[in-house]
């Protein structure tokens, strides 16, 4: 049977690996040697699952969205990651990695963040576990996500605004890697998505795989079968998508649909649709698809959503697209906003702008009445209310 899982060297097909400066070799090697042993140990599993249950509030509900289902002519279940503590899927990964860091004897935690959700999740877990926390965040994102910045500070984290480049997620990641190079002995870098050098893409996917583990059980209870016909998720770096599909990745009965950020349109030069626009390259230690110009320089990505404007893509998803295991759709800003308003009006759920891209993909699909669709709402929309308010003037007529 064809498998889409990672191999021992950290590759998904031709994508992945660890392309890193020499100064980080020891850190990454130490992590490669530790992560599998720790993640598979009984002590870790017990502590991780107890925190997911008692602190995060898992399992997150699998909610049959009746009015949305009626609109699209199929059965749509929403996997409600927006109901987790801190309001998104990011907390699953943050808890796992900080537990790993403690077991590795690290004292200082650093993280990058775009929308601020991963930053808040990491700061939250560091407060819980009494660890020093430094979060790198592009100045553009600091301005558009200031509520999350204040939350991180309140939680005791130091937020360092990054003023290089486009001042967004890519630049924050660059700064976090620089910090790690300078403090290799005592610092653990908590990457928030399925990006970066091996073992990060695999480790983050494993920690997020609790999502698909729960979907299997919940579908069995509600539909009498463990698998849906379609799994849908938004993809920036790819961690909520990886968690959503993890236990279904080799099950060809399930059609995987990934929604990436089309921005102002994939032909406009203002986009973050990496799978459609990217060419093979290396970004943040991984060989994957990267949005770049003729000279191989990484282009600045654009999306209305701070969590999706990354010019790379997790190697798992690059491989799924290459092997045609996943259908990838570019959803532009307007389509995402329309979908966010639609979910709010039909189901009383305000989604994050990132999740709204997955919802925007519903309109591009043709479902049968018997189809079972599971769509992951990766986060709640509180952080995006100002953007929605700006847009709402033109949309008040939406029924």
From Swiss-Prot:
It comes from the Bacteria. Disulfide bonds: none annotated. InterPro entries: Trp_synth_b_CS, Trp_synth_beta, Trp_synth_beta/beta-like, TrpB-like_PALP, TrpB-like_PALP_sf. GO terms for cellular component: cytoplasm. GO terms for molecular function: tryptophan synthase activity. It catalyses: (1S,2R)-1-C-(indol-3-yl)glycerol 3-phosphate + L-serine = D-glyceraldehyde 3-phosphate + L-tryptophan + H2O. PANTHER family: TRYPTOPHAN SYNTHASE (PTHR48077:SF3), TRYPTOPHAN SYNTHASE-RELATED (PTHR48077). The lineage of its organism: Bacteria, Pseudomonadati, Bacteroidota, Bacteroidia, Bacteroidales. This is Tryptophan synthase beta chain. Its EC number is 4.2.1.20. It holds the Pfam family PALP. Tetramer of two alpha and two beta chains. Belongs to the TrpB family. Pathway: Amino-acid biosynthesis; L-tryptophan biosynthesis; L-tryptophan from chorismate: step 5/5. Keywords: Amino-acid biosynthesis, Aromatic amino acid biosynthesis, Lyase, Pyridoxal phosphate, Tryptophan biosynthesis. The modification N6-(pyridoxal phosphate)lysine is found at residue 90. Its cofactor is pyridoxal 5'-phosphate. The beta subunit is responsible for the synthesis of L-tryptophan from indole and L-serine.
């Amino acid at each position: 049977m064809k498998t889409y899982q990672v191999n021992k060297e950290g590759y998904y097909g031709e994508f992945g690996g660890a392309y890193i400066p020499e100064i980080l070799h020891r850190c990454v090697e130490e992590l490669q040697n530790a992560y599998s042993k720790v993640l598979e140990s009984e002590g870790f599993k017990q502590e991780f699952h107890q925190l997911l249950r008692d602190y995060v509030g898992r399992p997150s509900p699998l909610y049959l969205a009746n009015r949305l289902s009626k609109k699209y002519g199929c059965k749509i279940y929403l996997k409600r990651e927006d109901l987790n503590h801190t309001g998104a899927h990011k907390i699953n990964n943050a808890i796992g990695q900080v537990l790993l860091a403690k077991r590795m004897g690290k004292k200082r935690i650093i993280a990058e963040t775009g929308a601020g959700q991963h930053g808040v999740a990491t700061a939250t877990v560091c407060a819980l576990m009494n660890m020093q926390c430094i979060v790198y965040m592009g100045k553009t994102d600091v301005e558009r996500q200031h509520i999350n910045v204040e939350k991180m500070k309140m939680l005791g984290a130091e937020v360092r605004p990054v003023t290089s480049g486009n001042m967004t997620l890519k630049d924050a990641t660059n700064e976090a890697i620089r910090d790690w190079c300078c403090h290799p002995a005592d610092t653990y870098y908590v990457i928030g998505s399925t990006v970066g050098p091996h073992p990060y893409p695999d480790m983050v996917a494993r920690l997020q795989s609790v999502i698909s583990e729960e979907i299997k059980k919940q579908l069995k209870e509600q539909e009498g079968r463990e698998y849906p016909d379609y799994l849908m998720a938004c993809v920036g770096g790819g961690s909520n998508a990886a968690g959503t599909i993890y236990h279904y990745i080799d099950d060809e009965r399930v059609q995987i649909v990934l929604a990436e950020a089309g921005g102002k349109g994939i032909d406009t030069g203002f986009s973050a649709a990496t799978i459609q626009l990217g060419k093979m390259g290396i970004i943040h230690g991984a060989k994957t698809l990267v949005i770049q110009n003729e000279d191989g320089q990484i282009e600045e990505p654009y999306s209305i959503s701070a969590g999706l404007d990354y010019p790379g893509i997790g190697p798992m998803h690059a491989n799924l697209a290459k092997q045609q295991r996943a259908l990838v759709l570019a959803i532009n800003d307007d389509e995402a906003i329309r979908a966010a308003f639609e979910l709010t009006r039909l189901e009383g759920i305000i989604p994050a702008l990132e999740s709204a891209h997955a919802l925007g993909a519903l309109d591009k699909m043709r479902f049968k009445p018997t189809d079972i669709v599971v769509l992951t709402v990766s986060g709640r929309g509180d952080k995006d209310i100002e953007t929605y308010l700006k847009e709402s003037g033109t949309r008040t007529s939406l029924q």
